[in-house]
């Protein structure tokens, strides 16, 4: 399944506009906020451009976790039973690029990351959490747009083995 990801070009424009406005009003604070924002799960990226660059360099698909890290019970359970386990971390390092797309209620997320996450949520039609999509990205540099080659999606699974087996089936298709 291939999705044309035209909203990313809007996101990239919005990102540069937000950075410019924030930099003008807050000095370098905008860059500091962005630099200090990290994923809830160690080792996960939060920026689609960084995930794309690493995916392109390694040839690995991106595995995006749409989560509500501070309020979603099933998201917390998935983190505890799968993402926090050494077995998963070892598997992920060999097989995927990890991208966390968080929709917290009590944690402050920079505006550019909020916009990125909302655009990706719309592009993948995510309506519940946790939702994990596995995909490849291609970028048209001239148009500054991504094309998504979706490999599959999953939600909560109780064990590392069950989770990784499911994702491996998506990757092999």
Positions of predicted regions on the chain:
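Non-catalytic, surface beta->alpha helical segment in thiol-disulfide oxidoreductase systems
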Residues: 122-173
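Typically the conserved alpha-helix immediately C-terminal to a functionally engaged Cys/Sec
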Residues: 75-91
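N-terminal "domain-start" segment that seeds a small globular fold
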Residues: 24-52
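Thiol-based oxidoreductase modules, predominantly thioredoxin-like and allied folds used
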Residues: 42-45, 88-115
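Short active-site neighborhood of thiol/selenol oxidoreductases, capturing the structured segment around
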Residues: 58-72
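A short beta-strand-turn-helix
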Residues: 44-62, 92
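The canonical Cys-X-X-Cys-His
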Residues: 72-76, 132
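C-terminal segment of classical bacterial N-terminal signal peptides
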Residues: 12-20
């Amino acid at each position: 399944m291939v999705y044309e990801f035209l909203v990313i070009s809007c996101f990239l424009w919005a990102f540069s506009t937000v950075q410019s406005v924030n930099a003008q009003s807050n000095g370098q604070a905008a860059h500091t906020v962005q630099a200090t924002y990290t994923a809830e799960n160690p080792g996960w990226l939060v920026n689609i451009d960084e995930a794309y660059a690493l995916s392109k360099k390694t040839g690995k698909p991106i595995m995006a976790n749409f989560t509500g890290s501070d309020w979603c019970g099933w998201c917390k359970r998935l983190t505890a039973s799968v993402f926090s386990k050494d077995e998963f971390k070892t598997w992920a390092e060999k097989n995927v690029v990890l991208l966390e797309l968080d929709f917290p209620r009590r944690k402050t997320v920079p505006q550019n990351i909020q916009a990125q996450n909302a655009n990706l949520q719309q592009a993948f039609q995510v309506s519940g959490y946790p939702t994990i999509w596995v995909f490849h990205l291609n970028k048209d540099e001239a148009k500054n747009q991504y094309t998504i080659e979706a490999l599959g999606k999953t939600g909560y699974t109780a064990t590392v083995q069950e989770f990784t087996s499911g994702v491996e089936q998506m990757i092999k298709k």
